[in-house]
């Protein structure tokens, strides 16, 4: 760009009109990925947000730096939920989050490398204990399935009605397992000739939920929620920062990838959403996570609300957000 920093370093702006745009972007991100890998502990993990423009290039860079064997997941995050009718082709509604481990665990018995956490279970209201079952709260599941699981047999209900499997379904349990469940009072018989149901006990399910690769706005927030969050912190200058991530999204990633004593590094920290999420999650689960935020002091546009409010560069916005979020 022809500009120079106060230290005498040449500043370069990579625009899409530059003939080497993608190559320059890859060079920029590659060096940062190498540094990130060196900073990760053996059980560490990295999450990288990216859109369609560089997703393919980022995946190749990550495969080379971390090794394709250490790829964990590519998450699709619902960034916006409204349709953009002015779009020429498709209205884009999502971004990606690539996840790589320093060392990936391939089997449940592995003890070295990254171990993802289960997400908190928030649907326990579906479980109850109307019959005072000694195993505790339960909910019902079908005893039949679409796919073949067990050989054919009949079930005799306490009222004498004989139940056969439906023609288009199969038993979900073997006959021996069904007999054991009946003996353990783990079957809900129902009235008349209705199909019995199996009890699924809350004590038998996992302590949490396995994360999936689709993050809906209800699960992880979206860009409109992110804007409302930062505007609520900077009420005197709404619109202080564009393109920020929702705290809920980063919190979900922290729940999956971090432990209570971990150090979280964000080297594109922007408005410091990651720091905000770390503090919020610590308050929720009693953790003592620490954060390191890295951001170049990019100047704010003089016409922007941030500049008018006295913030000369992005770092000043991030530091003030950390202070204000910490007070809440």
Residue ranges and their predicted role:
Residues 262-281:
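A phosphate-binding catalytic loop at a beta-strand-loop-alpha-helix junction
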Residues 280-328:
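PRPP-dependent phosphoribosyltransferase catalytic core
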